[in-house]
Amino acid sequence: MQPSIAPSTPIPRQETVELVYRIFGDVLVPLEQVRERWFRNLNKENFSKALACGRIALPVTTLDDSHKAMQFVALDHLAAYVDQRANQAGSARRAQPGADSIAS
């Protein structure tokens, strides 16, 4: 029996999963690599705060219960987050007055 997926859990596009895998090369991405690649505007402390308060909605996992355990983001969660942010940007763009009349 497969585990159930919560209805609110976004399912990433396969293309996004493949792209993120090509970038990072593993199913678990070290949190610091995520910050350095896609959140370089945030230092370690501000990135940690943004994760803790939910401003950056990425679930963080470890492979050990130790407080010193290395932190990771699962590839599918990272891909879903990228898709979600891209969709939000597209929705915001379409909602702007005159967005249809701007030539590409």
Swiss-Prot record:
Keyword Glycoprotein: no
GO annotation, biological process: bacteriocin biosynthetic process; positive regulation of secondary metabolite biosynthetic process; regulation of DNA-templated transcription
InterPro entries, sorted: Tscrpt_reg_PrtN
Domain of life of the organism encoding this protein: Bacteria
GO molecular function: DNA binding
Pfam families in UniProt: PyocinActivator
Protein keywords: Activator, Antibiotic biosynthesis, Bacteriocin biosynthesis, DNA-binding, Transcription, Transcription regulation
Job description of the protein: Activates pyocin genes, probably by binding to the sequences conserved in their 5' non-coding regions (P box).
Protein name: Transcription regulatory protein PrtN
Gene name of the encoded protein: prtN
